[in-house]
Amino acid sequence: MPHLFEGVGVALATPFTNNEVDYNALEKHVDFLLDNGVKAIIVNGTTAESPTLTEEEKEQVLESVIKQVNHRVTIIAGTGTNNTAKSIQASQRAKALGADAIMLITPYYNKTNQRGLVKHFETIANEVELPVVLYNVPSRTNMTIEPETVETLSHNQYIVAIKDATNDFEYYEDVKSRINQEEFALYSGNDDNVVEFYQRGGNGVISVIANAIPKEFQALYDAKQSGQDISNDFEPISKLLDALSVDVNPIPIKALTSHLGFGNYELRLPLLPLEDADAKVLINVFEQFKAGEL
């Protein structure tokens, strides 16, 4: 079966104005992403501040994006929680709204073992009957989907990809050696490692920085696919990524999306915006990047 997408998927930020979801800004941002060639949009993930969105807001944001995109690119809904039953409910709602696939994070806080992970993911997948992207991000969950577990899960007809945010190429190669990549896609969850990830045969990236530079980030993948050496092309992007590392995601990227006109620079507690001085430095680096001066 064809992969959900090849190239750049965007982990969409949620714009706020006066602490409410700004649907006009959301529409502008999605238009910007579509106009600049992204291949997928991931809604209600980490970058979306999903823990501080209400269930109603999550559904409304997803519905808004699905209607606007109108089948032009793949829509993946973040529906994973540390509660299997609630994950099923959220996934069924996403399916009813028209999502193309769901992304499921590993359970956090009430951590399980690898047997529990298999049961958790397979129960959701078999109940919902929608393509599933596994989300492995141990830096946030303190839980890893071991390569053997990925292999087991890859045999489920609905589990079709993994977002690998380990930044560990030994892990990547172990997983890659165990799966049939014609049927199971490997997506990076780290913008800073995409050059090597692509060189090692990865199918794409679920990206944070593409919220602000979708065209440039997709062009990088396209150049690699055409056989070009993209190391030099990545250098200015790498410098922008260094500037983005000033704080945890999505705090810095929302400074850039706000700068681009997609909502106010607002986050919901416990997240706070960058200090003014840090935001100015980041925006200055971004403007240098856009001007070709990095």
Curated annotation (Swiss-Prot):
Pyruvate binds at T47, I206. The record marks T46, Y109 as: Part of a proton relay during catalysis. It is an enzyme of class 4 (lyase). InterPro entries: Aldolase_TIM, DapA, DapA-like, Schiff_base-form_aldolases_AS. One of its GO terms (biological process) is diaminopimelate biosynthetic process. It holds the Pfam family DHDPS. Coiled coil: none annotated. Its EC number is 4.3.3.7. It catalyses: L-aspartate 4-semialdehyde + pyruvate = (2S,4S)-4-hydroxy-2,3,4,5-tetrahydrodipicolinate + H2O + H(+). Pathway: Amino-acid biosynthesis; L-lysine biosynthesis via DAP pathway; (S)-tetrahydrodipicolinate from L-aspartate: step 3/4. NCBIfam families: dapA (TIGR00674). PANTHER family: 4-HYDROXY-2-OXOGLUTARATE ALDOLASE, MITOCHONDRIAL, DIHYDRODIPICOLINATE SYNTHASE. Catalyzes the condensation of (S)-aspartate-beta-semialdehyde [(S)-ASA] and pyruvate to 4-hydroxy-tetrahydrodipicolinate (HTPA). Belongs to the DapA family. Homodimer. This is 4-hydroxy-tetrahydrodipicolinate synthase. It comes from Staphylococcus haemolyticus (strain JCSC1435). The gene is dapA.
